[in-house]
Protein backbone atom coordinates (compact mmCIF):
# COMPACT_ATOMS: atom_id res chain seq x y z
CA UNK A 1 0.00 0.00 0.00
CA UNK A 2 2.90 2.31 0.78
CA UNK A 3 4.41 1.68 -2.66
CA UNK A 4 1.05 2.40 -4.32
CA UNK A 5 0.79 5.70 -2.44
CA UNK A 6 4.17 6.72 -3.73
CA UNK A 7 3.18 5.86 -7.27
CA UNK A 8 -0.20 7.63 -7.09
CA UNK A 9 1.25 10.71 -5.42
CA UNK A 10 0.03 12.66 -2.44
CA UNK A 11 -1.53 15.70 -4.19
CA UNK A 12 -5.28 16.21 -4.04
CA UNK A 13 -7.19 16.48 -7.31
CA UNK A 14 -10.57 18.19 -7.49
CA UNK A 15 -13.07 16.71 -9.95
CA UNK A 16 -16.18 18.76 -10.76
CA UNK A 17 -19.15 17.01 -12.37
CA UNK A 18 -21.63 19.26 -14.18
CA UNK A 19 -24.93 18.45 -15.79
CA UNK A 20 -24.84 18.79 -19.58
CA UNK A 21 -27.25 21.17 -21.37
CA UNK A 22 -30.67 19.92 -22.40
CA UNK A 23 -30.56 21.72 -25.76
CA UNK A 24 -28.13 22.75 -28.47
CA UNK A 25 -28.43 25.22 -31.33
CA UNK A 26 -27.63 25.16 -35.02
CA UNK A 27 -27.03 28.42 -36.88
CA UNK A 28 -27.11 29.57 -40.48
CA UNK A 29 -26.29 32.94 -42.05
CA UNK A 30 -26.93 34.51 -45.46
CA UNK A 31 -26.13 38.08 -46.46
CA UNK A 32 -25.47 40.27 -49.50
CA UNK A 33 -24.45 43.90 -50.05
CA UNK A 34 -27.07 46.52 -50.90
CA UNK A 35 -27.58 47.09 -54.62
CA UNK A 36 -24.31 46.75 -56.52
CA UNK A 37 -22.23 47.14 -53.34
CA UNK A 38 -20.19 44.06 -52.50
CA UNK A 39 -19.76 45.05 -48.85
CA UNK A 40 -22.66 44.48 -46.47
CA UNK A 41 -23.26 46.97 -43.68
CA UNK A 42 -24.46 44.16 -41.41
CA UNK A 43 -22.37 42.14 -38.99
CA UNK A 44 -23.13 39.38 -36.51
CA UNK A 45 -21.68 37.33 -33.69
CA UNK A 46 -22.29 33.91 -32.15
CA UNK A 47 -20.81 33.58 -28.68
CA UNK A 48 -20.75 30.96 -25.93
CA UNK A 49 -21.60 32.57 -22.58
CA UNK A 50 -21.17 31.36 -18.98
CA UNK A 51 -23.89 29.25 -17.38
CA UNK A 52 -24.73 27.19 -20.44
CA UNK A 53 -25.93 30.09 -22.57
CA UNK A 54 -25.31 31.12 -26.17
CA UNK A 55 -25.62 34.63 -27.55
CA UNK A 56 -26.44 35.61 -31.13
CA UNK A 57 -26.47 39.25 -32.24
CA UNK A 58 -26.95 41.26 -35.43
CA UNK A 59 -25.96 44.87 -36.00
CA UNK A 60 -26.87 47.04 -38.98
CA UNK A 61 -24.76 50.16 -39.41
CA UNK A 62 -26.17 53.47 -40.65
CA UNK A 63 -26.22 53.70 -44.43
CA UNK A 64 -24.60 51.02 -46.58
CA UNK A 65 -21.25 49.81 -47.81
CA UNK A 66 -17.88 50.13 -46.10
CA UNK A 67 -18.87 52.89 -43.66
CA UNK A 68 -21.89 50.98 -42.40
CA UNK A 69 -19.75 47.86 -42.13
CA UNK A 70 -17.22 49.68 -39.93
CA UNK A 71 -19.98 50.94 -37.66
CA UNK A 72 -21.63 47.56 -37.18
CA UNK A 73 -18.23 45.85 -36.77
CA UNK A 74 -17.39 48.26 -33.94
CA UNK A 75 -20.70 47.56 -32.21
CA UNK A 76 -20.33 43.79 -32.48
CA UNK A 77 -16.73 43.84 -31.25
CA UNK A 78 -17.65 46.02 -28.24
CA UNK A 79 -20.64 43.83 -27.44
CA UNK A 80 -18.53 40.67 -27.59
CA UNK A 81 -15.85 42.15 -25.32
CA UNK A 82 -18.37 43.35 -22.73
CA UNK A 83 -20.21 40.04 -22.65
CA UNK A 84 -16.97 38.09 -22.31
CA UNK A 85 -16.05 40.40 -19.42
CA UNK A 86 -19.24 39.34 -17.65
CA UNK A 87 -21.53 42.35 -18.14
CA UNK A 88 -25.28 41.60 -18.38
CA UNK A 89 -26.62 41.81 -21.93
CA UNK A 90 -28.88 44.84 -21.44
CA UNK A 91 -26.20 46.76 -19.56
CA UNK A 92 -23.67 45.98 -22.29
CA UNK A 93 -25.98 47.42 -24.96
CA UNK A 94 -26.59 50.57 -22.91
CA UNK A 95 -22.84 51.02 -22.32
CA UNK A 96 -22.17 50.81 -26.07
CA UNK A 97 -24.90 53.38 -26.67
CA UNK A 98 -23.31 55.78 -24.18
CA UNK A 99 -19.92 55.31 -25.84
CA UNK A 100 -21.31 56.11 -29.30
CA UNK A 101 -23.36 59.12 -28.15
CA UNK A 102 -20.67 60.81 -26.05
CA UNK A 103 -17.67 60.00 -28.21
CA UNK A 104 -18.81 61.66 -31.44
CA UNK A 105 -20.08 65.00 -32.67
CA UNK A 106 -22.07 63.51 -35.55
CA UNK A 107 -24.78 60.90 -35.10
CA UNK A 108 -23.76 57.46 -36.33
CA UNK A 109 -26.38 54.97 -35.29
CA UNK A 110 -26.50 51.19 -35.47
CA UNK A 111 -29.15 48.66 -34.60
CA UNK A 112 -28.67 45.77 -32.21
CA UNK A 113 -30.74 42.62 -32.36
CA UNK A 114 -29.74 40.02 -29.79
CA UNK A 115 -30.98 36.67 -28.56
CA UNK A 116 -29.54 34.75 -25.61
CA UNK A 117 -30.42 31.06 -25.51
CA UNK A 118 -30.43 29.21 -22.18
CA UNK A 119 -29.41 25.70 -23.21
CA UNK A 120 -30.67 24.23 -19.92
CA UNK A 121 -34.17 25.71 -19.79
CA UNK A 122 -34.81 26.39 -23.49
CA UNK A 123 -35.73 30.02 -22.75
CA UNK A 124 -34.78 32.61 -25.35
CA UNK A 125 -34.18 36.17 -24.16
CA UNK A 126 -34.58 38.80 -26.88
CA UNK A 127 -33.12 42.32 -26.73
CA UNK A 128 -33.68 44.89 -29.48
CA UNK A 129 -32.55 48.45 -30.15
CA UNK A 130 -34.01 49.77 -33.39
CA UNK A 131 -33.95 46.29 -34.90
CA UNK A 132 -36.27 44.65 -37.42
CA UNK A 133 -38.81 42.01 -36.42
CA UNK A 134 -37.66 38.61 -35.22
CA UNK A 135 -39.71 35.60 -36.31
CA UNK A 136 -40.11 32.54 -34.09
CA UNK A 137 -41.26 29.59 -36.16
CA UNK A 138 -42.87 26.80 -34.16
CA UNK A 139 -44.61 23.68 -35.37
CA UNK A 140 -47.93 25.35 -36.13
CA UNK A 141 -47.40 29.07 -35.55
CA UNK A 142 -45.08 31.97 -36.33
CA UNK A 143 -44.68 34.78 -33.80
CA UNK A 144 -43.33 38.26 -34.59
CA UNK A 145 -41.23 40.13 -32.02
CA UNK A 146 -41.14 43.82 -32.95
CA UNK A 147 -38.97 46.68 -31.75
CA UNK A 148 -40.21 50.17 -30.91
CA UNK A 149 -36.93 51.47 -29.48
CA UNK A 150 -34.38 53.72 -31.19
CA UNK A 151 -31.05 52.41 -32.51
CA UNK A 152 -27.95 52.90 -30.39
CA UNK A 153 -25.96 56.10 -30.85
CA UNK A 154 -28.95 58.47 -31.06
CA UNK A 155 -30.00 59.42 -27.52
CA UNK A 156 -28.24 59.28 -24.15
CA UNK A 157 -30.92 57.26 -22.37
CA UNK A 158 -31.74 54.20 -24.44
CA UNK A 159 -34.76 51.98 -23.87
CA UNK A 160 -33.97 48.42 -24.94
CA UNK A 161 -36.92 46.24 -25.97
CA UNK A 162 -36.88 43.02 -23.98
CA UNK A 163 -38.86 39.78 -24.17
CA UNK A 164 -38.56 36.13 -23.14
CA UNK A 165 -40.01 33.10 -24.88
CA UNK A 166 -39.99 29.38 -24.14
CA UNK A 167 -38.45 27.58 -27.11
CA UNK A 168 -38.86 23.92 -27.99
CA UNK A 169 -36.94 21.35 -30.00
CA UNK A 170 -37.22 22.17 -33.71
CA UNK A 171 -38.15 25.85 -33.32
CA UNK A 172 -36.55 28.43 -35.62
CA UNK A 173 -35.50 31.90 -34.47
CA UNK A 174 -35.14 34.03 -37.61
CA UNK A 175 -33.41 37.39 -37.24
CA UNK A 176 -33.15 39.85 -40.14
CA UNK A 177 -31.89 43.40 -40.71
CA UNK A 178 -33.78 46.19 -42.46
CA UNK A 179 -32.14 45.30 -45.79
CA UNK A 180 -34.52 42.35 -45.97
CA UNK A 181 -37.51 44.44 -44.92
CA UNK A 182 -36.69 47.29 -47.31
CA UNK A 183 -36.74 44.85 -50.23
CA UNK A 184 -40.42 44.10 -49.56
CA UNK A 185 -43.45 46.38 -50.15
CA UNK A 186 -44.00 48.93 -47.39
CA UNK A 187 -46.66 47.89 -44.90
CA UNK A 188 -46.56 44.26 -45.97
CA UNK A 189 -43.05 43.26 -44.88
CA UNK A 190 -43.93 41.18 -41.82
CA UNK A 191 -46.82 39.40 -43.53
CA UNK A 192 -44.84 38.60 -46.67
CA UNK A 193 -41.82 37.39 -44.74
CA UNK A 194 -44.05 35.21 -42.59
CA UNK A 195 -45.53 33.73 -45.77
CA UNK A 196 -42.03 32.93 -47.08
CA UNK A 197 -41.06 31.28 -43.79
CA UNK A 198 -44.32 29.38 -43.47
CA UNK A 199 -44.15 28.15 -47.06
CA UNK A 200 -41.03 26.01 -46.66
CA UNK A 201 -40.32 22.74 -44.86
CA UNK A 202 -36.55 23.37 -44.74
CA UNK A 203 -35.00 22.23 -41.45
CA UNK A 204 -31.36 23.17 -42.10
CA UNK A 205 -30.67 26.69 -40.72
CA UNK A 206 -28.16 27.63 -43.43
CA UNK A 207 -30.54 26.53 -46.18
CA UNK A 208 -33.37 28.40 -44.47
CA UNK A 209 -31.35 31.63 -44.39
CA UNK A 210 -30.39 31.30 -48.05
CA UNK A 211 -33.98 30.46 -49.02
CA UNK A 212 -35.37 33.57 -47.30
CA UNK A 213 -32.74 35.82 -48.90
CA UNK A 214 -33.36 34.35 -52.35
CA UNK A 215 -37.15 34.68 -52.09
CA UNK A 216 -36.93 38.29 -50.90
CA UNK A 217 -34.54 39.31 -53.68
CA UNK A 218 -36.71 37.64 -56.30
Question: What is each stretch, according to the model?
Answer:
Residues 63-85, 167, 171-217:
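Active-site-proximal, acidic helix/loop segment immediately C-terminal to a metal-coordinating Asp/Glu
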Residues 8-61, 67, 74, 133, ...:
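N-terminal entry segment of metal-dependent catalytic domains or homologous docking segments
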Residues 125-154, 161-163, 190, 194, ...:
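PP2C/PPM-type serine/threonine phosphatase catalytic core
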Residues 54-57, 126, 173-176:
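Short hydrophobic-aromatic micro-motifs
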Residues 50-51, 105, 116, 163:
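Non-catalytic regulatory/linker segments of enzymes
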Residues 37-50, 145-185:
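Acidic loop->beta-strand submotif enriched in PP2C/PPM serine/threonine phosphatases
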Residues 2, 6-12, 69-139, 213-218:
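Catalytic core of PPM/PP2C metal-dependent serine/threonine phosphatase domains
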Residues 32-34, 51, 62-63, 119, ...:
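Short, glycine-/Ser/Thr-/acidic-enriched flexible segments
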Amino acid sequence: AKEQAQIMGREYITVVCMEGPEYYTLQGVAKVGKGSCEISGDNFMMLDLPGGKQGVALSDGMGSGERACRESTLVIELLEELLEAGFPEKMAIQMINTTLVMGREEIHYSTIDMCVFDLYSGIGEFLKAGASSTFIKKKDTIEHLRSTSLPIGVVHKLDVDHAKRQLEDGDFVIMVTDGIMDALPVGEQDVLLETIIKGTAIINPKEMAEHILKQVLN
